[in-house]
Amino acid sequence: MTLLALGINHKTAPVSLRERVSFSPDKLDQALDSLLAQPMVQGGVVLSTCNRTELYLSVEEQDNLQEALIRWLCDYHNLNEEDLRKSLYWHQDNDAVSHLMRVASGLDSLVLGEPQILGQVKKAFADSQKGHMKASELERMFQKSFSVAKRVRTETDIGASAVSVAFAACTLARQIFESLSTVTVLLVGAGETIELVARHLREHKVQKMIIANRTRERAQILADEVGAEVIALSDIDERLREADIIISSTASPLPIIGKGMVERALKSRRNQPMLLVDIAVPRDVEPEVGKLANAYLYSVDDLQSIISHNLAQRKAAAVEAETIVAQETSEFMAWLRAQSASETIREYRSQAEQVRDELTAKALAALEQGGDAQAIMQDLAWKLTNRLIHAPTKSLQQAARDGDNERLNILRDSLGLE
């Protein structure tokens, strides 16, 4: 049995290839059935995200194994083999185990240390459990990777610092306000970045969020998810005074929030401070706003400096994480080797028990026919001894003929001979 990990990711393949190799959720069962129909495959898990498509397999060794699996992947997706080979990586046994642990821990992600990948790996594993998982070693490898990912997050600072613009914006807000549960947040825009910001804020117990967007329909979908109120962009001037925090990310070519608008809001708030985080490019907030007393304006460049600093911290934590992965990989491979020995022991014991049962049955039959009990028992003992020592004796003789002293010593040790 061999463990394999093969696939492509954001480091080896452009998005144009990654999207062609991805497995859609509605066809995943079909793909797993097709994969497990391959004669060499004993068990399989398919991990398919926007940044990677990987197959984790338990296989029987055979000639042209790599070619057979690449051919299956190309046939399934109707790809040219040469196009795929240039971007494909292939890991076996120790390297496959280490790779999965690194992936689950966020060490192989586009955003170093990002936590979402662990959930994606867990889902891929759960999907494979629906009648597709046939290899206990593969199952154990995934379970081990989950515990390793948890250990990495617990024992290192890999996830402690923000390295995405959305997360950095929320981290900044948490640093300035003692508690986010009592503040009102105005989100301007409803795109992907604002979606991430809104979800982060909800996780930090923000009770009141207002979403201002050009189109109400898109904003309403997000508002329903996070429990926010939706307003039009034209209502910002009137509602701005309610907001303690404003986070803006639109595609507007011109600023949406001007200096005069913020001045009026501050006056209505009796100069209670406001935090404005402008993630947009071009900017949504006029730079002059930053000159106002009690208005604290941060641009995407300010966030980028925070992210760069935090990324350096994550890279330092990643070194510690790699040490954990190496240690856990070594322990898993030791367990795997022990499992291999256990199977050999089971086969050897089963073989011995089969000989015992066969000879005992013959002896009992002879006794039932009235044979001499002492002679029958002596014959049983003699035959049982000869049958059990036959194979080891042949191995000892062959090692002696070959002059293989190392093998002779191993056999002597195995047989308990001094």
Swiss-Prot record:
Effect caused by changing R314C: Loss of activity
Top-rank taxon, per record: Bacteria
Record EC number: 1.2.1.70
Signal peptide positions (record): none
CDD domains, A to Z: NAD_bind_Glutamyl_tRNA_reduct
GO molecular function: glutamyl-tRNA reductase activity; identical protein binding; NADP binding
Binding site for NADP(+): G189, A190, G191, E192, T193, I194
Described purpose of this protein according to its UniProt entry: Catalyzes the NADPH-dependent reduction of glutamyl-tRNA(Glu) to glutamate 1-semialdehyde (GSA). In the absence of NADPH, exhibits substrate esterase activity, leading to the release of glutamate from tRNA.
UniProt-listed HAMAP family: Glu_tRNA_reductase
Family that this chain belongs to: Belongs to the glutamyl-tRNA reductase family.
Record-given protein name: Glutamyl-tRNA reductase
